Amino acid sequence: MGKSVVILGAQWGDEGKGKIVDLLTDRVKYVVRYQGGHNAGHTLIINGEKTVLRLIPSGMLHPNVTCLIGNGVVVSPEALMKEMGELESRGIKVRERLLISEACPLILPYHVAMDHAREAALGKKAIGTTGRGIGPAYEDKVARRGLRIGDLFNKEAFAEKLKNILEYYNFQLVNYYKVEPVDYQKTLDDVMAIADVITGMVADITTILDTARKNGEHILFEGAQGTMLDIDHGTYPYVTSSNTTAGGVATGSGFGPRNLDYVLGIIKAYCTRVGGGPFTTELFDDVGAEIARKGNEFGAVTGRPRRCGWFDAVAIRRAIQLNSISGFCMTKLDVLDGFDEVKICVAYKMPNGEIVEYAPLAAKDWDGVEPIYETLPGWKENTFRITDVNKLPQNCINYIKRIEEVTGVPIDILSTGPDRVETMILRDPFAA
């Protein structure tokens, strides 16, 4: 009997999803991306070799896996071809194993130009986007004016649609943002030069997934970003432009929600966030700096330093509600080695004195919120690369168990290093 498993970030992204997807891909036939775009950087380290995948599913490094990009993903043709080229130069036959929905919206140069222009205009109030055109591409999708991969099949119609939409964008870029317009002919020529390669990978993703399920195949859905960045349920407006929660699987791939068997929430042993927005447990002291240093907390795509803080069980409880999380995978446990004490935020004190155990929704509702911590003894022993749970320090085990208690969800997988072998699977999601 095949199982369908979702892997998603339960915090603000950068939790280490790529490694865990890669680890569990050994068990599956299909790996599916269902939301986001090339703003998601999944870093994999296999046999000491580092690979960063931004758009193509992490399963591409496994020769027997077919990778699918669902309709919920916005696709930059330029980024796709660049990533394909990087993988093909290593002997990976991407075109034989990558299939893409024709309903995927395209990210084109005018989306990137608009993204940069808006962030510059906002100044210090900027959202902190990756500047890759993700948001504007999703806007076009909702406004029903966007170009999609399926439009590449009719080159004449594509050229006409592109001309109309570029007039719309260039008017804003020139007259409102006072920046250079995007060149129509260059944009058209660049896309047409690679159109046949992209259309050659188009497939009916929904039917492929339905057939795989009926045939008893294991399927893995690979989420990008994190729950607290969800466009609807995250810390709005400091969010991404897609549904990063488990509901995005159904809408972003066409896979029926009743067919999902297990949702694995990836959590760091602490918390990080990139860009603006509320972050209740953020540390501004030497402890925060030490976590950032030990955890090498810099964005895989942007290179920006990540904000660091203690584990926030309040935000995680919201993630559990939103995703019906079956179990956690805790990553970067080894980063907390050596601290005299470790803390877990178990509640928030609101500005009016109310104590709450679930995170607010809108960013404005986080203003003035204070974390209420439980402090536990730390551990001096080294947990890096430990692969036997019985060899973990007792205080480390106590920390893990306390997180399970305050969240009500078991930690089924533990990660103690960047390589996929540096992992303890306590309960296999495909056997749960």
UniProtKB/Swiss-Prot annotation:
Active site: D14, H42
Reaction equation(s) it catalyzes: IMP + L-aspartate + GTP = N(6)-(1,2-dicarboxyethyl)-AMP + GDP + phosphate + 2 H(+)
Cofactors required: Mg(2+)
Localization (cell): Cytoplasm
UniProt keyword annotations, A-Z: Cytoplasm, GTP-binding, Ligase, Magnesium, Metal-binding, Nucleotide-binding, Purine biosynthesis
Binding locations of GTP: 13-19, 41-43, 306, 332-334, 415-417
The protein's enzyme class: ligase
EC number: 6.3.4.4
Function per UniProt: Plays an important role in the de novo pathway of purine nucleotide biosynthesis. Catalyzes the first committed step in the biosynthesis of AMP from IMP.
Family the UniProt entry places it in: Belongs to the adenylosuccinate synthetase family.
Name of the protein: Adenylosuccinate synthetase
